Swiss-Prot record:
This is Alanine--tRNA ligase. The keyword Phosphoprotein does not apply. It comes from Methanosarcina barkeri (strain Fusaro / DSM 804). It is found in: Cytoplasm. The keyword Nucleotide-binding applies. The gene is alaS. Belongs to the class-II aminoacyl-tRNA synthetase family. Its cofactor is Zn(2+). GO terms for biological process: alanyl-tRNA aminoacylation. Catalyzes the attachment of alanine to tRNA(Ala) in a two-step reaction: alanine is first activated by ATP to form Ala-AMP and then transferred to the acceptor end of tRNA(Ala). Also edits incorrectly charged Ser-tRNA(Ala) and Gly-tRNA(Ala) via its editing domain.
Length: 923
């Protein structure tokens, strides 16, 4: 369908001919008149291994600089890389391509690009081939996509296909690449609702670059069909290129694998720690690695069947058995994967991702745990942070990673500890799950393995190992981690918001938000544009509509004859709807009326103080805890506010004190709160992506709020200066989910009231203990010590009572099949006494004990000595059945169990039932 798109003057004027690949059937352009295949794997093998294709070798830094300088000389503006966590996107967690930097606002034409044309080297992370990393010799989780982009409009073209092709060819020529070795393969591209013709740049079996010419958008009525979808022309059109930095380096060196080209020092270090020799100057060994990489280019090695096939082919080609080859390759592949994964983690953690069980944090933890598992397999006994430190030393272009390294180390210590704990707990969880499937005679299914990993972090390899001990089979695909990564790679699609009164509102203009122009004004006049169901739409308003975690303003709307209370304000597609209280149903307002609005000043100021305080506390937390701190959510109320922060551990009391002190210092500095409307591009360039802590607002213009050093895109109401906020008091913190700390605080009058409440509690407590407030800690500590001593004495006394009671109970025991059975109601005993008595009786192997009490509600305890256990008596089963009769429940171990209920009238029935069950078991 796009065949005509490739009929370029560039090809015609530079000696190219269009051919059809005899292997894959795709069309390609080449200067080599004798070429029969397209140059892509698997149609062509990797012939660059051992045969570098450029005139010189490059390392990563040298290649990146060569590329960017080349395009600067060709009129492109170099721009800085974006983070690998896509802070500017709400549909994507990780940056997967350079074009993702400019989606959706630049690519849609809403916002101008930061430069045009531009060049960038963008670090990207893709986990969809996670299981192929290390095995294939070429796959990476993290790679830099070098790119040159041009953003064109129909009335203003920067450059298009012809010049893009010329630039690419000139770059390759400047590297002294043999022109006959280059193929340009036609391959239509589609993704993310866009499409266009695409050219793959192929050399010696390796895809070095992809040139996408994005000029189509998904359209059910479109006339262009690509991969089963219809498209139509876009208003703008974009040159979207991607050159693989790491592949250029590999091709320049001709190393056996991409890992040896990129990280030779780290690979050698890890090989040594694993007790392996990595002698690339040994031609036989180097040939094994090279042949493995060459043949891996022909297949997907993430699947076991293909991996085995690869092993067979490599073994056959070098005259070695498959088992011997596997013994050589498997540990080497793990070293390669560890090297790659730790580089990936350097970018992830260095750019502020906090490992957790959700979103980008989940993906970071996935990579961490997979790495730790492989390190365990190879018995590499160094901290993860040591390997990351090696990477950071090799990346001077990223000084931020060195600055953040202390936090990275701390995060990894925490994550390794969690991983070890998971492994310990995981064994018990798997045993329980495997026991269930053993009863049914089934293998543990993939869905259960996925659940075990998602919910508990238990890797499938461990599940297989533990389950096999119980005799239960486990099978999982070799691309298990790729599947998991793909499942969690994208944000959940938001349900399309149902706009109430959509038909009613769609004809109305957007409401002017006058409170932005005059933030301190609270009274105003407005024209009624519509009124329905106690809802009023005005031409302009000073009422803030609920949004950004800030509740709506309240107040009144008045006519000459009546005053109506405003109880809610919401915004729908830019139209602000005021809901009024109208209990008698008589509404004396009509379209076109001029009304007077009055905002509740106390509520507005209280919420503005809390909103401004949220910025202040966020900034203080970042300064105390580290630059990784990211706002994960916020909500303001009149009496307090809460701020959710991404952080890898609990905030300590000392850190909270520092945050609170720093926040109040910012208040006392009385800095002006600055708000301004800026173009999105300008704001991002000046302030970075910390702008989007509160979410990503739409539009070309965004409202930027500066509170001290905190700068965010924010639509809320704020104080005119930090001094107006008043005192800030942190009330409490809690961990609401893994990786997220919630900080609750109050500001202004609410903070004073909170402090007064705390003072009252202290005063009342001091009064109760008859000591001055300043002596309260010492007094509480003394009383607590005395209480602990009394508790110990009480426990000793209960043990003595239990021992004394044992002889009496044994004397009244019943004989059942050679066992002594005690069934006794002890009304005065608490649960601890019952437990100690039953435990004491466990010393007698032939005794079964059934005890009950109603001193603390109905309590039941059962125990069974060793002889009783061998007869089939199970204390847990006894208690479960007895507890049912007293309207309760219970359970425990076969030797000792506890339970209870709410019906004391059935205690004797429960004891009788227990005795009956013992007799049945002894038959």
């Amino acid at each position: 369908m796009l065949e005509d798109e490739y009929q370029l003057e560039f090809f015609k004027n530079n000696g190219f001919v269009r051919k059809q690949c005899q292997s894959c059937g795709k069309f390609f352009w080449t200067r080599d008149l004798d070429r029969k295949t397209c140059g892509d794997a698997p149609c062509d093998p990797y012939t660059f291994i051992g045969n570098p294709i450029f005139s010189r070798e490059f390392d990563i830094s040298q290649m990146r600089e060569y590329y960017l300088s080349f395009f600067e000389e060709k009129g492109h503006t170099r721009i800085n890389r974006y983070p690998v966590v896509a802070r500017w996107r709400d549909d994507l967690y990780l940056t997967i391509a350079s074009i993702a930097d400019f989606q959706p606002f630049v690519t849609s034409g809403q916002v101008p690009p930061p430069a045009n044309p531009l060049t960038i080297s963008q670090p990207c992370i893709r986990l969809n081939d996670l299981d192929s990393v290390g095995r294939s010799g070429r796959h990476l989780t993290t790679f830099e996509m070098m790119a040159h982009h041009a953003f064109n409009k129909r009335d203003h073209e920067i450059y298009w296909k012809e010049h893009a092709m010329e630039l690419c060819d000139e770059l390759l020529t400047s590297l002294k690449l043999d022109p006959l070795a280059v193929s340009y393969k036609e391959e239509p591209w589609a993704g993310g609702g866009n499409a266009g013709p695409c050219v793959e740049v192929l050399v010696h079996g390796l895809e070095l670059a992809t040139l996408v010419f994005m000029d189509l958008k998904a359209d059910k009525k479109g006339d262009v069909l690509i991969k089963g979808e219809t498209y139509s022309k876009m208003d703008n059109y974009i040159v979207d290129t991607g050159y693989g930095l790491e592949r250029f380096v590999w091709a320049s060196k001709g190393s056996p694998t991409i890992y040896d080209a990129l990280f030779p020092g780290i690979v050698n270090e890890l090989m040594g720690l694993a007790g392996l020799e990595h002698e690339l100057d040994n031609s036989e060994y180097a040939n094994i690695l090279a042949q493995n990489a060459r043949l891996a280019g022909f297949m997907d090695v993430s699947e076991q069947s293909n991996l085995l096939e690869l092993r067979k082919k490599v073994a056959s080609s070098i005259g070695m058995t498959v088992d011997k080859l596997s013994a050589i390759m498997e540990p080497v592949e793990k070293v390669y994967a560890i090297t790659d994964h730790t580089r990936c983690l350097t970018f992830m953690l260095g750019d502020g991702i906090i490992p957790s069980n959700v979103k980008a944090g989940y993906l970071a933890r996935l990579v961490i745990r997979r790495t730790l598992r492989m390190m365990d397999d190879l018995d590499i006994r160094i901290p993860l942070s040591e390997i990351m430190d090696m990477h950071i030393k090799n990346m001077p272009e990223y000084p931020e990673f060195r600055e953040n390294f202390p936090v990275i180390q701390d995060i990894l210590v925490s994550e390794e500890e969690k991983f070890r704990n998971t492994m310990e707990k995981g064994r018990r969880i798997i045993q329980k799950s495997a026991s269930h499937f053993k009863k049914t005679g089934e293998k543990i299914p993939l869905s259960q393995l996925t659940e075990l990993y998602d919910s508990h972090g238990i890797p499938p390899e461990m599940a297989k190992e533990v389950a096999s001990e119980i005799g239960v089979g486990v099978e999982f695909p070799d691309n298990f981690y790729s599947i998991i990564g793909e499942l969690h790679n994208k944000a959940e699609e938001k349900e399309e918001e149902v706009v109430p009164f959509a038909d009613r509102l769609k004809h109305l203009p957007k409401t002017k938000r006058s409170f932005y122009d005059e933030p301190t004004r609270l009274e105003f006049e407005a024209v009624v544009l519509d009124i329905f169901d106690n809802n009023i739409v005005l031409d302009n308003t000073f009422f803030y509509a609920e949004g950004g975690g800030q509740p709506a303003d309240m107040g009144t709307i008045a006519t000459a004859y009546a005053v109506y209370k405003v109880v809610d304000v919401q915004v729908y597609d830019g139209v602000i709807v005021h809901t009024i209280e109208n209990p008698d149903g008589n509404l004396d307002i009509r379209k076109g009326d001029i009304v007077n609005g009055k905002v509740d000043e106390k509520r507005r100021m209280t919420l503005a103080r809390h909103h401004t305080a949220t910025h202040i506390v966020n900034d203080a937390a970042r300064k105390v805890l580290g630059t990784h701190i990211w706002q994960a959510g916020a909500q303001k109320f009149e009496d307090h506010s809460r701020l959710d922060l991404s952080h890898y551990k609990h905030i300590s009391p000392d850190e909270l004190k520092q945050i609170e002190l720093l926040a109040n210092r910012m208040v006392m500095e009385n800095k002006r709160v600055v708000t301004e409307w800026m173009s999105r591009t300008e704001a991002e360039q000046e302030y970075g992506f910390g702008l989007y802590q509160g979410g990503v607002p739409p539009g070309e213009k965004i409202r930027v709020v500066k509170v001290g050093d905190d700068v965010e895109a924010c639509a809320g109401t704020h104080c005119v200066s930090t001094g107006v906020v008043g005192p800030i008091k942190i009330l409490r913190t809690e961990r609401i989910q893994d990786g997220v700390e919630r900080v609750e605080f109050a500001a202004g009058v609410a903070a004073v009231r909170a402090m007064q409440k705390i003072d009252s509690l202290l005063s009342d407590s001091a009064k109760t203990l008859s000591v001055p407030p300043e002596q309260l800690p010492a007094s509480v500590e003394r009383f607590f010590g005395e209480w602990k001593d009394l508790k110990k004495e009480n426990e000793k006394l209960k043990e003595e009572i239990a021992r004394a009671r044992v002889y009496r109970l044994l004397g009244g025991a019943s004989e059942v099949a050679g066992l002594k059975v005690i069934a006794e109601f002890i009304p005065e005993a608490d649960s601890l006494e019952l437990q100690k008595t039953a435990t004491e009786l466990l010393k007698h192997e032939d005794v079964v004990t059934l005890l009950a009490s109603d001193a603390e509600g109905v309590k039941l305890v059962a125990s069974a000595g060793q002889k009783a256990l061998s007869c089939g008596i199970n204390a847990g089963s006894l208690v479960r059945e007895m507890s049912k009769l007293v309207s309760g429940g219970g359970g425990g171990k076969p030797a000792l169990a506890m339970g209870g209920g709410t019906d004391p009238s059935k205690i004797q029935d429960a004891l009788a039932r227990g005795l009956e069950l013992v007799k049945e078991a002894c038959k």
